[in-house]
Amino acid sequence: MDAGAQFGVAPGLNEAVLMAAQERHLPFFPGIMTPTEVDRALNLGWKHLKFFPAEPAGGVAMLQALAAPFAHTGVQFIPTGSITAATLADYLALPQVAAVGGSWMAGRKLVAEKAWSKITALTAEALKIVARTQNKTGRTKKFHPAG
């Protein structure tokens, strides 16, 4: 926060980090991959969770199976991890997905090569996928980190 962060994201569920974020009123998204971790996060008061690593963990099918028993809680997921333009729409179509993260648009190699036009093109493609998905599902993702 001292450096200007408006929210935080982690790959795992670390209770000390969650409590520090809570003390500073920092919107924070702990990482989960199992039902036990979802249950633990919910018991600690967190309803916006990073599903990581999404694709290696089983992708959309795994997230649907993981989310189903918790549907009554209002939990929302932010899948990240090996997601690409080819899988973006599948995640966005899920009602329990608040947002999707992906590094394919600005990967380390592209940044190191200063491939700004490629990064811009990949980001524009992702935004088109988002718009098409919203038009198809009739839903927009109105997600605000603070709640």
Where is each model-derived feature located?
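C-terminal helical cap(s) of enzyme catalytic domains, especially alpha/beta-barrels
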Residues: 21-23, 109-141
